[in-house]
């Protein structure tokens, strides 16, 4: 019954998309695997496996070949009790804890940094995969704005507008994009259009739960991302480029010093 309601909602969303905006049939892809471990029993999020099938649906819409699940490194942490247990303290939920499964694509190196809600001062290092025994295993939880840089040198960049449902989805994109900008519409006061323009982002994807996709309040927050004012991101890019040049110069100086010491 509930699935039928969701299908009707998704159909309405798909019908009203503008040309050039592509619909990812996540529900259709997940329905093919309904008997697998797609949702936590004690939490409101999808699992790493459920998010993988969401990623497969995205790849089909984007014309990308998904990385086979069989080629990824699987890590598992047992004993996870999520929000449903935290809110109810129900013993039957406690007696059936979840397991957190992460699937790590092969051969990908990443660097993740996050910024506060209002500006680009004081960036903090983070990780794509965190050693957490809960849903924070994916991109270390929620932050207003995260930038992930990979060793995939294809020049492709993507921005992901998300709530916490998108965390487990983002981790699979590292195989396909050189840069990934992760924006949490609930917390970020950054101007997304300015960031996309300054960073020359190619793709934009919305990774949110059904309730967020149809809620007037959350739609308003996502719309605000286009109008909010913040520090120009191009200044951050200039600072990063200057730092790369400085690192390169220091690397050359270190090499020269080593050669001189040898003689």
Descriptions of predicted regions:
Residues 1-263:
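Extracellular glycan-modifying ectodomains
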């Amino acid at each position: 019954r509930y699935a039928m309601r969701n299908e009707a909602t998704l159909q309405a969303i798909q019908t009203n998309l503008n040309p050039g905006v592509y619909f990812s049939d996540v529900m259709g892809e997940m329905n093919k695997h309904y008997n697998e471990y797609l949702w936590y029993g004690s939490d409101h999020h999808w699992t790493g496996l459920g998010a993988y099938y969401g990623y497969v649906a995205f790849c089909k819409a984007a014309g990308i070949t998904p990385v086979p699940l069989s080629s990824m490194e699987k890590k598992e942490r047992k004993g996870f009790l999520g929000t449903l247990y935290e809110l109810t303290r129900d013993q039957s939920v406690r007696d059936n804890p979840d397991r957190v499964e992460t699937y790590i694509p092969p051969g990908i190196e990443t660097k993740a940094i996050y910024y506060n809600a209002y500006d680009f001062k004081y960036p903090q290092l983070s990780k794509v995969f965190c050693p957490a025994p809960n849903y924070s295993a994916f991109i270390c939880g929620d932050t207003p704005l995260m930038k992930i840089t990979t060793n995939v040198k294809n020049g492709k960049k993507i921005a992901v507008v998300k709530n916490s449902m998108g965390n487990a989805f983002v981790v699979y994109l590292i195989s396909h994009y050189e840069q990934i900008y992760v924006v949490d519409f609930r917390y970020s006061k950054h101007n997304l259009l300015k960031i996309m323009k300054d960073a020359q982002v190619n793709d934009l994807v919305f990774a949110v739960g059904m309730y967020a996709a149809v809620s007037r309040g959350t739609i308003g927050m996502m719309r605000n991302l286009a109008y909010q004012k913040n520090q120009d991101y191009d200044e951050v890019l200039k600072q990063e480029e200057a730092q790369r040049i400085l690192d390169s110069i220091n690397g050359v100086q270190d090499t020269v010093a080593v050669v001189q010491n040898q003689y």
